[in-house]
Amino acid sequence: MKELILISGKGGTGKTSIIAALASLAENKVLCDADVDAADLHLVANPQVLSRAEFRSGHTAAIRKSKCSECGLCRELCRYSAIDADYHINPLDCEGCGVCVYFCPEKAVDFPENTCGEWFISDTRFGPMVHAQLGIAEENSGKLVTLVRQEARKLADEKKHDLILTDGPPGVGCPVIASIGGASAVLIVTEPSLSGIHDMQRVIELANHFKVPAMVCVNKFDLNPDLTAD
């Protein structure tokens, strides 16, 4: 099975348009949208959701006031100042480190897992697709990218398809690293601008670091023929 990941050093280069074009031509493939922070492949694929599941990751502490003795130990130990004078934990400040849970003498602090988003298996006009949506301001997008890629492989195995086309996230951060690890190849979509070239060079270095074969597609090539030639 081959897995081709389309990535770019910056947003707006047109990689979703390119992968939609490839999807319309390729056969026996599964589509995968790994840009979970700003998924948009569904805009051109017109998916009909067949199944959906919650994505859970990380924890946020919550104090049960009925058991809390207000001893102040949790407020003293919290390095993120997430606990106010009324012993209420601000979920925006809580980093989920768990120190309040561990040291609370009354065992009054719950530590539920966060629901960060959803992932989907859909049928599209191009064929089956696995995609996801991370919640607003939620973290751990790299873990969701990994989950989406794993589910795409399972779906390809079930349907006996030999190609996965993945729309990866832009940039060079954690989500991109999660999207290219172990891939057969990456196609870097860039544009003929100074920022486009600079960001392309960074993502090429990233692909080389993980020993993933890289190819380059210069989209909107006629914007600057000189830079395209370079």
Residue ranges and their predicted role:
Residues 1-26:
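Walker A (P-loop) phosphate-binding motif
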Residues 106, 112-121, 143, 147-230:
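Conserved catalytic-core segment of NTP-binding enzymes
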Residues 3-5, 28-30, 162-165:
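Residue-level preference for the first positions of well-ordered beta-strands
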Residues 73-90, 99-115:
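Iron-sulfur cluster-binding cysteine motifs and their immediate structural context
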Residues 133-142, 194:
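Flexible beta-alpha connector loops of hexameric P-loop NTPases
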